[in-house]
C-alpha cells in the first residue's frame, strides 16, 4: 500500500505544476528519488558474472531499460532527471546515443512539458542511415541549439562522450552530460576530462546494498 500511496503523490506532481512550489516539492523529490531506487532494485538489478558494453567484467548488472521503459517508472525518471538539469540555461533539446538514452530523453521531454518547459528530444544513431535522409541524429534539427546529452548508466563515459561529439559535429552546443546512474568506475572523470559538465541522478552505491561498487 505504501508503494501505491507514493506513486499517487508522484503522479499528482507530474500533472500539477503548482505542486512544484514551496517546501512540499523538496520533500516529495526525496520520495520520488527513493521510489526510483526501489524500482531499480526490484526490476533492474541482477547479480552474477557479466560483461559490460565497455568490455569490463562486473559482479552485478543494472538493466535500466527494464525501468526506463516501464509505464510506472518512466514519469518518475522524467521528474528526477528534469530536476537534475532544470537549472541549466537556454537548453533546447535532450538526447543521446541510442538506445539507452532514448527513453530517458523522452521521459524528460514529457515531464518538462507538464511543468511548462519546452525540451525537444533527439536520438543519436550508432551509424548514419544509408537511405532516406541519411541522418545520424534523428528528431528536430539540433543545429545551432543548446543540448544536454543523457544516458541511462555509464561505466567509462564513452557512450555519452560519443553522443556529445556527434551533436557538436552537427552544429549543436553541449551544455552538459547527465546520467541516471553513475557506476562510479571513472565515467565522471573521463567526461570532465573531455571538457563537459557532468551530472548524475544516482550513484550505483545508492542502489547496491553493499557499501562499495565492484
Curated annotation (Swiss-Prot):
Pathway(s) it belongs to: Pyrimidine metabolism; UMP biosynthesis via de novo pathway; UMP from orotate: step 1/2
Reactions listed under catalytic activity: orotidine 5'-phosphate + diphosphate = orotate + 5-phospho-alpha-D-ribose 1-diphosphate
Pfam families per record: Pribosyltran (PF00156)
Role according to the record: Catalyzes the transfer of a ribosyl phosphate group from 5-phosphoribose 1-diphosphate to orotate, leading to the formation of orotidine monophosphate (OMP).
Binding site for orotate: 155, 183
Protein name, UniProt field: Orotate phosphoribosyltransferase
Residues binding 5-phospho-alpha-D-ribose 1-diphosphate: 125-126, 129, 131, 151-159
Amino acid at each position: 500500500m505504501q508503494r501505491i500511496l507514493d506513486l499517487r503523490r508522484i503522479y499528482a506532481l507530474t500533472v500539477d505544476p503548482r505542486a512544484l512550489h514551496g517546501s512540499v516539492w523538496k520533500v516529495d523529490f526525496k520520495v520520488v528519488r527513493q521510489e526510483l531506487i526501489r524500482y531499480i532494485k526490484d526490476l533492474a538489478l541482477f547479480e552474477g558474472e557479466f560483461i559490460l558494453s565497455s568490455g569490463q567484467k562486473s559482479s552485478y548488472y543494472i538493466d535500466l531499460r527494464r525501468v526506463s521503459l516501464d509505464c510506472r517508472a518512466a514519469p518518475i525518471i522524467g521528474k528526477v532527471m528534469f530536476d537534475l538539469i532544470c537549472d541549466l540555461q537556454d537548453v533546447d533539446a535532450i538526447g543521446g546515443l541510442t538506445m539507452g538514452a532514448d527513453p530517458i530523453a523522452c521521459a524528460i521531454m514529457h515531464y518538462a512539458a507538464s511543468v511548462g518547459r519546452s525540451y525537444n528530444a533527439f536520438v543519436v544513431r550508432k551509424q548514419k542511415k544509408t537511405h532516406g535522409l541519411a541522418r545520424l541524429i534523428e528528431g528536430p534539427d539540433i543545429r545551432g541549439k543548446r543540448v544536454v546529452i543523457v544516458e541511462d548508466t555509464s561505466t567509462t563515459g564513452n557512450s555519452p562522450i560519443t553522443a556529445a561529439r556527434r551533436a557538436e559535429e552537427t552544429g549543436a552546443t553541449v551544455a552538459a552530460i547527465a546520467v541516471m546512474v553513475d557506476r562510479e568506475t571513472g565515467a565522471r572523470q573521463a567526461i570532465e576530462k573531455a571538457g563537459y559538465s557532468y551530472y548524475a541522478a544516482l550513484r550505483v552505491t545508492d542502489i547496491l546494498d553493499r557499501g562499495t561498487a565492484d
